[in-house]
Amino acid sequence: MKKLLKLAVSAAIALLPPAAAFAQTDITWWDFLSGGDGIRMKALIKEFNDTHPDIKINATTLEWGVPFYTKVQTSAAVGQQPDIMTYHMSRYPLAVPTGILRPFSDEELASAGIKKENYVDAAWKQATFDNKVYGIPFDVHSIVLYYNKTILKEAGLLGDDGLPKGLDGLDNFNAALEKIKATGKVEYPLSLHTDEGGSMWRVFYTLLSQQGAKFIDADEILPGDAGAKALQTMANWVTTGYSPKLISYEASIALFTSGKAAMHINGVWEVPTMVDLQKNGNLGFEWGAIEIPNLMGKQATWADSHSFAIPNSDAKPIAPEKVKIVLEIINWMNEHSISWASAGHIPAYKPVTDSKEFTEMQPNATYAKLADTAVFDPVSKLAGVAGPIYEATQNFVVPALNGQLEPEDAIEQMREELKSQM
């Protein structure tokens, strides 16, 4: 009987799952990352899960933009929010005052080994309100100037180091566009995505910031004439034929990759497109990418950051034990963000950007210095991805670029539209 009992107990034990399975913690993750970004993030999540048997990230990708942020807010209200999510830092000025994000305490950050000095200063500041940290930056992503080395060399605009020369200062830049046009080798010297507000906001805000101007100053929208000057500069590129009129995102890229445009302003997220085309022999020229030249007097470039944050929920606050695990995940993701850099993004974690592997990654390492002069969207509820400023840019800046509004009139109408929403 004793023997049979021992056999029965042994059999029961054998059927039990490993002890580690009992200790596994499930973490719910939401992001909005598609395309190449999505592929890279899924690979990072898989690697984390494979190397952390006691933690399992269950990831869901939702629709980018307003649908994502609306879903976060409504889910948190009823206690069905994720444990961790990606969040654009340009949305923090809207999210923090409305209580959407849960702040991290100094003790929580210290216990996880997360230190301010290890992160890009501009990005860390964007996550900090009233000395409270509401998220941890993952990258800095910005716009850059893509260029065709063959065309620039023929126009006398390429240095021996393979980098453009003679582009700083608006007069010099416009003269360079004319030199490129004079070669007769391209349809456009500069390709811009001129039919959509988001893309044009990034260029407009860059030129505005390069004048040392603010989009919002106290209660004023676009004080002074800096906004009109920035918009007039962009409109001139279109009216002179340097840049295309009312062209879609895909077509603006195709102009550059087909060799029909010598330069192209777009986000760093298109770096993988260029890398893949060249690798597969489908790009008929050598290319590079640099930070936007200083055209208006001060080096500055629009930027945003992907970050990690915890939704705030009064209905079902996250448990302290899960906060600890979430911070462990965030720390790991940043320590392994070199693979994220291959998407064109600049890692916000300085030990990665200081690494030998990153400094040898081109053209990323060349334009990475833009993080030091990055300018985030205004600290306002009007700002941020898919916010009112983006909509106003679509309604007023885009028509001005394409000859449907005078730049000064467009700026005045933009002021009135946004002032009513402040």
What are these regions (language model features)?
Residues 34-56, 393, 411:
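Short, polar/charged alpha-helical segment
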Residues 24-34, 55-60, 84, 134, ...:
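Short, well-ordered beta-strand elements
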Residues 50-51, 56, 155, 232, ...:
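Extracytoplasmic/periplasmic substrate-recognition and gating elements
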Residues 88-144, 174, 188, 200, ...:
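Hinge/lid segment of periplasmic solute-binding proteins
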Residues 122, 287-292, 342-399:
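Long, aromatic- and glycine/proline-rich binding clefts that accommodate carbohydrate-like moieties
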Residues 26-43, 62-65, 141, 195, ...:
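Extracytoplasmic "Venus flytrap"
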Residues 50-51, 56, 108-112, 128-199, ...:
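Helix-loop-helix "hinge/cap" segment bordering the ligand-binding cleft or interdomain interface
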Residues 43-47, 51-119, 154-156, 262-263, ...:
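Extracytoplasmic "Venus flytrap"/periplasmic binding protein-like
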